[in-house]
Amino acid sequence: MNGLDKIIARAAEGCVCKESREKLLAIEPQCDPDEVRYALEQTDAINSLLIKNGSPRFGGVEGVSQLAARAVKGGVLSMGELLMVAGALRNFQNLVSWYGSSEHDALPTDDLFYALAPQPGLEQQISSAILAPDAMADTASHTLNELRKKIRATENSIRDRLESMVRNMDTSKYLQESVVSIRNGRYVVPVKSEYRGEVSGIIHDVSSTGATVFVEPQAVVEANARILQYRAQEAQEIERILVAFTGQVAAIEPQFQYSYKAMLEIDVLLAKARLALDMKAFKPTVRTDTSFSLIRARHPLIDAKKCVPVDISLGREYDSLIITGPNTGGKTVTLKTAGLLCAMAQCGFLIPADERSEICVFDEFLVDIGDEQSIEQSLSTFSGHMKKITGILELAMPHTLVLLDELGAGTDPAEGAALAVAIIEELRRRGVLLMATTHYAELKVFALET
């Protein structure tokens, strides 16, 4: 049903993580009553917690499961990847705190939240040591801190010497401008090309015009070399820290994967619950027989202010419901409402209907619904209509909900009515629950007499 796809897509917008969004978009109606009941209870539990506690602090992460798996295989995680791991660990902690922020009895979601292993120590270590995907804090280790102190001290010494040089009247006359810059990781001064021999040092670059050569004065060559040495040692120390953090991630990989999977499930439930709040939806009772009763049901895709609630019952007193009335009278909306709400519930969504509503679990939803405001009474429409009906008859069986809009339309009224009666009788013989709309008076009589 296209309507169900739209509802699922709308709910998926509430997912924080891309992986859980994809998981929700792939959801399909469940056919086991116990699974449907459990899924509804989980969504209802999270819905109640959202009302009590508000939304949890929960940031989007993506592909972190693969990062943990790579750590186990010996790959070294980058700073950005470690920050993603820390973000996931922070999510675990925030979800645990949110779940425990209000007292409640045992809930069907307990196992998901108890599966979360936050590892606050590791999360804090990573977050303190790594400031950004390309920036590690000086305090990440004592060695790194000492190396950076040496780098800064040496750089300051070089700048002081070069700035003194560019201010010196005897030297400045050879310079293109009085600035200190960096070329190839070395501090240099811009010397006029014609005076290159007047400033002793190593040429590292030439301007595009050839008018300027960038010279590393001999006085700072040794200091520049020390900086390069310190930079190499700095890179080695950063790599050592990354290897150490990666090892810690690898050590918790089994718990992390279990927690990550639970987090994605929770994200899906939060998205479902947010949709329920938005729709003012409730948990229906799941019946074990083949009958349902929707009380004050509203079409989930129509503005609640414009939607007229409707009561729909089927399967107890009668197995087929024929809806008649003029165009724009709401017949098609009623069909769609019944089908969508039953399918929503089987996907674990709360439904926009009174909490006294009851649903059953169908194995199939067989639908032929058009737009009652633009039905073309033509041979091509009738042919397409009959092709769909033929397909429905091939699949119809007990525990199936069949929804037919304008049954028999598109042909001679007398023939259409007779055909519609024959189709209804065959579907009833197959043991389906059937809802159909019609304009034919003959079907009204048939419904009353059957």
Where are these regions (language model features)?
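Non-transmembrane, heptad-repeat alpha-helical coiled-coil rod segments
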Residues: R231-E265
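Extended, charged coiled-coil "arm/hinge" scaffolds of SMC/Rad50-like chromosome-maintenance ATPases
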Residues: P118-D134, E222-V243
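Conserved amphipathic alpha-helical "coupling/scaffold" segments
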Residues: M1-T143, L147, I252-Q255, S259-A273
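Extended, Lys/Arg-enriched charged tracts that mediate electrostatic binding to polyanionic substrates
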Residues: N145-Y195
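ATPase nucleotide-binding head domains, primarily ABC-like/P-loop NTPase cores
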Residues: M279-K280, R287-T450
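Divalent-cation-assisted or electrostatically stabilized phosphate/pyrophosphate-binding catalytic cores
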Residues: T212-V213, Q218
